[in-house]
């Protein structure tokens, strides 16, 4: 068994792992226990009553966090002509067409989010095996295949978080930094949870929201009382 460091052990002191914490209290505890020498990310995980192996139980979407994510997001855009110019003006880090396809095919992926105009998808489609496993493949369902590239770039830079359920029925995302104030973190958590709840698929049966937990990069995990996730 791996040895637990003194810092981690201290962070877990006083944590009741059987308790469901009100969200606001959980955020306060997480911030107090964050002792790393860097600005830790606040992570939320939601266990859902779905089986993503079935198409009618897939959960995915995008949410614009009201207070941003606190991280610098590099955005790549596949576009030509005026749309390429719009993407650059909006702050895209990488803009290209055939040249960008070649770059990605070589394994050079220096971006966190990928956007494409509809006319570029026949080209971008060739990159499915490269971008798909990394969760970077543009998709119209989450607004990353669009003619309004400027809005998509600004949303990505400003706090848009894409989510997709994993095989075990878990959806998770970074929703801020421990340097955020407590209200900002709580607002982001509630926005994320609301988006996941609204994305409930038609095939979901029984209890959809099974468990919610929150943690920081190096901190303890706390279970959240789901009834406290609604905006007050």
Curated annotation (Swiss-Prot):
One of its GO terms (biological process) is regulation of translation. One of its GO terms (cellular component) is cytosolic large ribosomal subunit. Keywords: Repressor, Ribonucleoprotein, Ribosomal protein, RNA-binding, rRNA-binding, Translation regulation, tRNA-binding. PROSITE patterns: RIBOSOMAL_L1. GO terms for molecular function: rRNA binding; structural constituent of ribosome; tRNA binding. The keyword Cell membrane does not apply. It holds the Pfam family Ribosomal_L1. Binds directly to 23S rRNA. The L1 stalk is quite mobile in the ribosome, and is involved in E site tRNA release. Belongs to the universal ribosomal protein uL1 family. Part of the 50S ribosomal subunit. NCBIfam families: rplA_bact. This is Large ribosomal subunit protein uL1. It comes from Chelativorans sp. (strain BNC1).
């Amino acid at each position: 068994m791996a040895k637990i460091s003194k810092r981690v052990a201290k962070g877990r002191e006083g944590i009741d792992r059987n308790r469901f914490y009100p969200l606001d209290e959980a955020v306060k505890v997480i911030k107090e226990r964050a002792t790393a020498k860097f600005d830790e990310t606040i992570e939320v995980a939601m266990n859902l009553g779905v089986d993503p192996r079935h198409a009618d139980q897939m959960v995915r979407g995008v949410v614009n966090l009201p207070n941003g994510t606190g991280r610098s997001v590099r955005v790549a855009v596949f576009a030509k002509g005026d749309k390429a110019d719009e993407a650059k003006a909006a702050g895209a880090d990488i803009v290209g067409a055939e040249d960008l396809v070649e770059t990605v095919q070589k394994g050079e992926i220096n971006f966190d989010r990928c956007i494409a105009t509809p006319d570029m998808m026949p080209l971008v489609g060739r990159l499915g095996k490269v971008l798909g496993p990394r969760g970077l493949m543009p998709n119209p369902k989450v607004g990353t295949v669009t003619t309004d590239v400027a809005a998509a770039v600004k949303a990505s830079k400003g706090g848009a978080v894409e989510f997709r359920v994993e095989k075990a029925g878990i959806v998770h995302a970074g929703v801020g930094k421990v340097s955020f104030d407590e209200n900002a973190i709580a607002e982001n958590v509630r926005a994320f949870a609301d988006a996941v709840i609204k994305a409930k698929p038609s095939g979901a049966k029984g209890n959809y929201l099974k468990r919610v937990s929150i943690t920081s990069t190096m901190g303890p995990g706390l279970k959240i009382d789901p009834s406290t996730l609604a905006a007050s």
